[in-house]
């Protein structure tokens, strides 16, 4: 079976906006980049539970975005394509937040 083509997402809905602003999150709850940025901020100040909640939201928004753009659950999502970076960061933040709350199974 041939591998699928790499997914190249369109621009993140919150691209160019302040990802940490409440107004941005309220206007663009479908933005993985918003939730990834919020998770990263909360981890940096030690609020592991809130970081995990933001990261989990970002992960699910990422899956929604990938599937809406033809991803079938496998195949490359290159970080070199800038609009993919919010999705990839959201997935990475879930791993980091999971580790922070002691959920090793989710981290692995």
Regions found by a protein language model. Give the residues of each.
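N-terminal alpha-helical interaction modules that lie
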Residues: 1-73, 91-92, 96-108
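Start-of-helix signal in alpha-solenoid helical-repeat scaffolds, especially tetratricopeptide repeats
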Residues: 32, 81-88
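Acidic, Ser/Thr- and Gly/Pro-rich intrinsically disordered linkers and low-complexity segments
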Residues: 71-81
């Amino acid at each position: 079976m041939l591998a699928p083509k790499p997914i190249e997402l369109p621009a993140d809905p919150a691209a160019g906006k302040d990802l940490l602003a409440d107004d941005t999150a309220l206007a663009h709850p479908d933005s993985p980049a918003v939730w990834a940025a919020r998770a990263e901020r909360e981890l940096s100040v030690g609020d592991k539970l809130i970081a995990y909640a933001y990261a989990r939201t970002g992960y699910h928004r990422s899956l929604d975005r990938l599937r809406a753009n033809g991803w079938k659950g496998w195949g490359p999502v290159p970080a070199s394509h800038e609009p993919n970076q919010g999705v990839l960061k959201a997935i990475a933040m879930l791993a980091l937040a999971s580790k922070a709350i002691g959920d090793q199974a989710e981290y692995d």
